């Protein structure tokens, strides 16, 4: 699996260099899909990832994907992914400060969707 993850990250880097954040995000999600939400499972350093818990790695990768979705103006996808992070922090970590930050992030993306819709309707 290590070679696969390294390949995924090299593709992500290539697509980011080509300014294709939508494709980079889709590719990075392939790594995310390999991970669960286990806080006790410690993962070794791999590709661009330091040694960390499976939970922390998935959060970090999701955060990268959300940033790429934002660059690609895929705010609906970002909203869904932020919602999953919010749910995990609410149910599994009881980190309500982080939950509040995720809700603010979702609100920001909803405002971007609204602004884009208003712009389209005004055209």
Regions found by a protein language model. Give the residues of each.
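Nucleo/cytoplasmic regulatory scaffolds in medium-to-very-large eukaryotic proteins
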Residues: 1-123
């Amino acid at each position: 699996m290590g070679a696969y993850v390294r390949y995924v990250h090299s593709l992500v880097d290539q697509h980011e260099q080509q300014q294709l954040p939508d494709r980079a995000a889709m590719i990075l999600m392939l790594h995310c899909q390999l991970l669960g939400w286990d806080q006790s499972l410690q993962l070794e350093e791999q590709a661009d990832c330091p040694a960390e818990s499976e939970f922390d790695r998935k959060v970090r990768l999701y955060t990268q994907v959300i940033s790429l979705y934002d660059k690609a103006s895929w705010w609906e996808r970002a909203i869904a992914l932020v919602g999953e992070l919010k749910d995990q922090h609410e149910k599994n970590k009881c980190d309500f400060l982080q939950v509040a930050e995720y809700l603010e992030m979702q609100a920001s993306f909803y405002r971007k969707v609204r602004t884009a819709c208003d712009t389209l309707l005004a055209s």
